[in-house]
Amino acid sequence: MDPLVQAASVLAAALAIGLAAIGPGIGQGNAAGQAVEGIARQPEAEGKIRGTLLLTLAFMESLTIYGLVIALVLLFANPFG
């Protein structure tokens, strides 16, 4: 395999996982903060807020997992070589 293609694949994999982790990480922090704030305002709605938060966090985390899958494909099942 061409060393330039291999280097580009490694760089693309690093960018894929890095960028895929930044957005959901910020979003999860904001969502958790808002959930804590909502529970502090309305303690009786804690169960509903917690359930919605966990579902939301799972959807956000799936974006990071998709980035990881793309990075692994670029590293080990290189489509360019």
From Swiss-Prot:
The gene is atpE. This is ATP synthase subunit c. PROSITE patterns: ATPASE_C. One of its GO terms (cellular component) is plasma membrane-derived thylakoid membrane. Belongs to the ATPase C chain family. Pfam families: ATP-synt_C. The lineage of its organism: Bacteria, Bacillati, Cyanobacteriota, Cyanophyceae, Nostocales. It is a multi-pass membrane protein. InterPro entries: ATP_synth_csu_bac/chlpt, ATP_synth_F0_csu, ATP_synth_F0_csu_DDCD_BS, ATP_synth_F0_csu_sf, ATPase_proteolipid_c-like_dom, F/V-ATP_Csub_sf. F-type ATPases have 2 components, F(1) - the catalytic core - and F(0) - the membrane proton channel. F(1) has five subunits: alpha(3), beta(3), gamma(1), delta(1), epsilon(1). F(0) has four main subunits: a(1), b(1), b'(1) and c(10-14). The alpha and beta chains form an alternating ring which encloses part of the gamma chain. F(1) is attached to F(0) by a central stalk formed by the gamma and epsilon chains, while a peripheral stalk is formed by the delta, b and b' chains. F(1)F(0) ATP synthase produces ATP from ADP in the presence of a proton or sodium gradient. F-type ATPases consist of two structural domains, F(1) containing the extramembraneous catalytic core and F(0) containing the membrane proton channel, linked together by a central stalk and a peripheral stalk. During catalysis, ATP synthesis in the catalytic domain of F(1) is coupled via a rotary mechanism of the central stalk subunits to proton translocation. Key component of the F(0) channel; it plays a direct role in translocation across the membrane. A homomeric c-ring of between 10-14 subunits forms the central stalk rotor element with the F(1) delta and epsilon subunits. Keywords: ATP synthesis, CF(0), Hydrogen ion transport, Ion transport, Lipid-binding, Membrane, Thylakoid, Transmembrane, Transmembrane helix, Transport. It is found in: Cellular thylakoid membrane. The chain crosses the membrane at residues 7-27, 57-77. One of its GO terms (molecular function) is lipid binding. It comes from the Bacteria. The record marks E61 as: Reversibly protonated during proton transport.
